[in-house]
Amino acid sequence: MAKKSLVVKSERPAKFSTQTYTRCERCGRPHSVYRKFHLCRICLRELAHEGQIPGMKKASW
């Protein structure tokens, strides 16, 4: 889990548009966040395995 202070800091409006960065909406993780889902790779994987994300399934080839 991300530090509460950093999550609150990321929610504040940035002074400049280049200072914004993505955080996972579920856990607050700042790295490897998918823009389409607003989730980090770990949360995305967990929700996909639970069937919470429609149309997403585990790939096998």
Swiss-Prot record:
Belongs to the universal ribosomal protein uS14 family. Zinc-binding uS14 subfamily. Its cofactor is Zn(2+). InterPro entries: Ribosomal_uS14, Ribosomal_uS14_bact, Ribosomal_uS14_CS, Ribosomal_uS14_sf. It comes from the Bacteria. GO terms for cellular component: small ribosomal subunit. Signal peptide: none annotated. Binds 1 zinc ion per subunit. This is Small ribosomal subunit protein uS14B. NCBIfam families: PRK08061.1 (NF005974). Binds 16S rRNA, required for the assembly of 30S particles and may also be responsible for determining the conformation of the 16S rRNA at the A site. It comes from Pediococcus pentosaceus (strain ATCC 25745 / CCUG 21536 / LMG 10740 / 183-1w). The gene is rpsZ. Zn(2+) binds at C24, C27, C40, C43. Part of the 30S ribosomal subunit. Contacts proteins S3 and S10. Keywords: Metal-binding, Ribonucleoprotein, Ribosomal protein, RNA-binding, rRNA-binding, Zinc.
